[in-house]
């Protein structure tokens, strides 16, 4: 089973922007009081879950989630920019509704000043290819964003990107995927 990685995906914890209906995009963002509590619960929930390593988006809200959840544990947390949320460009920091109205149009066409969902999926695919070829990683927890999960659904579960982008994002306590050597080699 060389190269097979169990991937556990968790979104960053609740932010002040989430609570206000703001699409943070590539802005840093910060956890709300409730979000800090949820991050602590994430650490408790996953601490004895055979996690070998944590990969985390380098955006502030994801980093804060990882620090609260896994700070003071022996788990190594590696930050990776490829796990970032979609760059909404001119709409970073705009109301969620304004971004949601544009989602389907932005599967292949970038947001003005930003990127497309296919662009974000391609960068996540590069990371998945690296994971699939690494014999040292077996069960990896990823802390990311909506676009990260949609990329996983597309690349690892074979769901059409247009469908996952158009579906509602229902939060839950993690999603699990399997990364195989050939699973992520198609970035679109």
Regions found by a protein language model. Name each.
Residues 2, 47-50, 131-138:
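Glycine-rich phosphate-binding loop signature in dinucleotide/nucleotide-binding domains
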Residues 3-73, 115-118:
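Active-site-proximal alpha-helix that buttresses catalytic centers in soluble enzyme cores
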Residues 69-126:
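Phosphate-handling substructures
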